[in-house]
Amino acid sequence: MKKTLLNKFFSFSIGGYISILIGLISVPITTRMLTPEQYGIASIISLIVNILMLIVSLGLDQGFVRFFYEEKEEARGKLLFNCLYYPIFILFVIILGIIFFNKNISEFILKKQEFYIALILIAMLIFTLANRFSTLVIRMEQKAKLFSFFTVLTQVLNFLFILLFFKIYKDNYKTIVLATLFSTMITTILSVIIEKKIWSFKGESNFTKRELLKFSLPLSLTMALTWIFQSSDKIIIKIFTGMYEVGIYSAAFKIIALISIIQNGFTTFWAPVAYEKYSKNPSETLFFEKVFEYVSLFFLVLGAFILMSKNLIILLLGETYVEASKVMPMLVFIPIMYTISETTMLVIGFKKQTKYFLIISITVALLNIIGNLILVPVLGAKGAAISSGCVYIVFFAMRTYYSMKLINFKFKLKKLYLILVFMLLYALYLTFYNNFLYTIVFGIILEILIFIVYLSTIKEMYFKFIKKREI
């Protein structure tokens, strides 16, 4: 793994690290501005936008990623156009549906009728679609510094707009929703202007709209199932316990989102690098095995530290959201297992074996729904967190299993699973008990165990990177 590769990773990630610092400032302020109920409403609106985006995109954003490097550079604008063609058509249909069913949508979210909700959803859909592809363009061109710039700009603008709209709306969901909308709008417009060459849609693509859709549509179904897996928890919490618990759950996710920023930094860097590496040498496995090892070590250490620091969440979120500190521990597994799985599963995409994505998505979606239906009525948001955390471990295991069926990777899984057992027990303890001394002691023991189990990996990383040696 060469120094230039690491430089590229840190260039992609630097925006995430700055965003974490911004988040540490903005999250405590935001949670003190809004009650859990209003936070919950904003979260449900965001959830609906994400659902509709799955329908609108038809998986063609993934098609753009898959065929980007196989397309001639001068024709990538046309590839972008072909990937946007069907989503734009579907977007207009969805907009008509939102207008027609606006009363039902408003009743579901607010328990009263407000056409304003329909306008917000329409605006957010338009700019979220444009933002997804404008971000992908920068990401696939591997313009790391520009990507980091927009990551930071989005966070800064979002925070500033929250402060602005709070003066107008006070404790109201509109404060967060409008801040998200306007920050997305500005960064999208700027990124399209900067990348105007590819957005001119020029050239003759090697791939037809039908060919792109044929590849992407199965992924769209998989992504829909993945959404059910990832988001059914909030819907079930709303049905069984109400907006207060949704707000608590969403606040706990705000803490996890700070880890997810690092996750996004890695996955943004990793996907194009991995595809490029595979296209040059499909038989190369050592590179992927080493990345798996290093990423596992980093995220396990980070996860144990976050769990050990759980009591700081009370200070961070404020007394109103104190229950979120009991929800957060099991949610830690979401970014950890997702990120580690990204290092093992890309071969499924390489080999175009999308049926495995479908099998995985159906399995984990069903498991999470069953887990939530059993645990949420009894434990509320904590039950949803337990279900999600456990199912994400299954998610990682299945992704890795099918990947290793396609290529004979030699991932060192035993030591990862050993640490996961102890981390899972630790997280469950923190979900139900809050003894400060035991929290710290158990956390330190877990960190020591990680360092012992991964000692050979730590030594290897030291000599390769600290000593500035290359593979």
Predicted regions: what is each one?
Residues 1-5, 145, 173-179, 189-230, ...:
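Interhelical loop/hinge segments that connect adjacent transmembrane helices in multipass membrane
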Residues 4-61, 90-99, 124, 155, ...:
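Signature of the first transmembrane helix
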Residues 8-23, 154, 176-191, 195, ...:
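Transmembrane helical elements of multi-pass membrane transporters/channels
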Residues 56-72, 140, 256-293, 345-350:
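Helix-loop junctions and terminal segments of transmembrane helices
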Residues 67, 127-150, 199, 332-363, ...:
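Membrane-interface junctions at transmembrane-helix termini in multi-pass inner-membrane proteins
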Residues 119, 149-197, 363-367, 381-402, ...:
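Hydrophobic alpha-helical transmembrane segments
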Residues 409, 430-471:
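Membrane-proximal transmembrane or re-entrant/amphipathic helices at the cytosolic face
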